Amino acid sequence: GNKVTTIQGEGDERTVSTVEKNALPGGKWEMIESLRGIDEETPSSCTRTVKKYTEGGWLTISRTEGYKTSLAQTTLYTYNDQFRVSLEIKPDGGYTRYEYDDQGRTVLSAAPWAGGGEKGTRTTYADLRFNDFRPATETEVIIAENGEETALLKRTYTYEDSPQASRTTVTETALGSDQVHTSVEEAYGEAAEYAYARGRQKMSQGIDGVQTVYTYEAATEYGALHKVTATVQAHGTIVPAQSTRSVHYLAENGATTRKEQYVHTGKDWSL
């Protein structure tokens, strides 16, 4: 095995981190990482990770937090023939199990439920483009011990992409309810005139109909490159005394150099 020790910081604040690697029988390795203060005997944290070499590369089969203490917590991992985690066993004995499609996308994640059986999420995918990991539907389900499933909640995602904007609409319906909650997210497309805006948030609308609309333009003051304006409105209209507008001036590194907050008076925007 080998052991590497690194010391960071200054004076009494220094910390010592140690990484130790050892070969174990059966093509496995363990890595023990610990961290302690320079004057301390006992590590403040110690983690042991065990990996096994397989056709799918190195796979983590267990991870222990608080290693070599009475509070040690170990998580175990089992893999399927795609070398993806099929079962994660938690330190408290609970678990999460995963099922995948042939593209390796999660189609089910489920864990024990207080009411007996399991509670989980089933996911289908949009498949509108190559390797599309965007969900088409997410259904929250209860899986009884006999395998029978009950849907509690279903979210449906629709995607509209144009050079101007990409729009994602999410509709949510709960079991036994005829209420449909809809939320919308939009991002600027490749055709956005101001290059900085491309791919950035254009509009977000909550299930209450309140929208925030974002615009981006070049800034010439406050040492900023970009000016981002976010306007809050309801159902597409400005509401006096309720609609707000915030302006952020952003430097080249993304830091905000100035922020302004306005409210609409009924005639115009006032600080």
How would you name each of these model-derived features?
Residues G1-K90, G94-L271:
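Beta-strand elements of repeat-based all-beta scaffolds
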